[in-house]
């Protein structure tokens, strides 16, 4: 419940900021390449949120507190998230300068989406996760977390 809710609000923030930025940039026509860039940036955000949430669950299963698990889970996913976003930003920057017309607009939309995706994954979703977890009385039940029980070998 808790992490899914944080993801939904993070993704809604991503969508609203993305739409606002695209509408404020003059002269960008939304074509098939632009739509694919929007979908790809949204999929990146979902994928990296999932990766961070998986790390949080793994950290919690080792016995850490929920707040500590969130902090170390995001810390573990930071390098992969930043690497992927930086590489894709540089690729879209190269495409932006090496192309014209429809590909030029798609590269601009993808660059914008990569930056917004990184900000929402690393900042907004994490912020909403902390907000809901600070208000939940039964934090562990709120996120449906379970600790792994150590099985004893006989």
Predicted regions and their residues:
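A cytosolic-side transmembrane-helix exit/cap motif
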Residues: 23-36, 52-61, 123-133
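Interfacial segments of transmembrane alpha-helices in multi-pass membrane proteins
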Residues: 1-31, 97-102
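Hydrophobic transmembrane alpha-helices
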Residues: 11-12, 32-50, 112-115
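Hydrophobic alpha-helical transmembrane segments of membrane transport and translocation systems
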Residues: 58-154
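Short alpha-helical transmembrane interface motifs in multi-pass membrane proteins
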Residues: 2-6, 36-39, 75, 109
């Amino acid at each position: 419940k808790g992490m899914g809710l944080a993801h939904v609000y993070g993704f809604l923030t991503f969508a609203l900021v993305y739409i606002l930025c695209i509408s404020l940039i003059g002269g960008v026509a939304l074509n098939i390449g632009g739509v694919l860039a929007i979908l790809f940036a949204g999929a990146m955000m979902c994928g990296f949120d999932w990766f961070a949430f998986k790390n949080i669950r793994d950290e919690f299963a080792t016995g850490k507190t929920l707040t500590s698990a969130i902090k170390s889970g995001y810390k573990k996913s930071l390098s992969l998230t930043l690497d992927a976003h930086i590489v894709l930003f540089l690729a879209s920057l190269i495409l932006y300068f090496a192309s014209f017309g429809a590909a030029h607009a798609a590269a601009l939309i993808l660059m914008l989406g990569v930056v917004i995706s990184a900000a929402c994954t690393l900042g907004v979703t994490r912020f909403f996760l902390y907000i809901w977890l600070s208000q939940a009385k039964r934090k562990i039940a709120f996120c449906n977390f379970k600790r792994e029980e150590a099985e004893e070998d006989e």
